[in-house]
Amino acid sequence: ENSTAIVMITKLKERKEKCSEYMPLKCGEKHTYENFEIEIKNVRNADHYTVRTIEVRNTEEDNATHTVYHYWYAEWLDHDTPEKLRGLLTLIQEVGLRCPDIANSEYGPVVV
């Protein structure tokens, strides 16, 4: 949907599986899902979250590419809230700066 950012606030596994690994995790890794090739172009570890720059290539549409920023806040506990909110608030602020005017833009929504 032409989204610029994905925000994930769960671990892949906590006692049991919470989320499937739907993308590669390391810089330079590629996965192919049907006609979409997903490549991690950059990984940046912030204090409380990780940001991955992902290039999505549509192999059926002249190899058209789209950049997506994946924010992963993995400190949210299974049945609790974070003890300290600074990391979560910093993440929200960074996403807001990256996607400042979604309502009046050609880009899709932030996916949470």
Swiss-Prot record:
Domain Tyrosine-protein phosphatase residues, every copy: 1-112
Biological process terms in GO annotation: signal transduction
Keyword Hydrolase annotated: yes
InterPro entries with a match to the protein in the record: Prot-tyrosine_phosphatase-like, PTP_cat, Tyr_Pase_KIM-con
Enzyme Commission (EC) number: 3.1.3.48
Entry GO CC: cell junction; cytosol; plasma membrane
Stored Pfam families: Y_phosphatase
Alphabetized PROSITE patterns for the sequence: TYR_PHOSPHATASE_PTP (PS50055)
Catalytic reactions of this protein: O-phospho-L-tyrosyl-[protein] + H2O = L-tyrosyl-[protein] + phosphate
Enzyme superclass (EC): hydrolase
Keyword annotations of the record: Hydrolase, Protein phosphatase
GO terms, molecular function: protein kinase binding; protein tyrosine phosphatase activity
Family: Belongs to the protein-tyrosine phosphatase family.
Name used for this protein in its record: Tyrosine-protein phosphatase 8
Lineage: Eukaryota, Metazoa, Chordata, Tunicata, Ascidiacea
Gene name of the record: STY-8
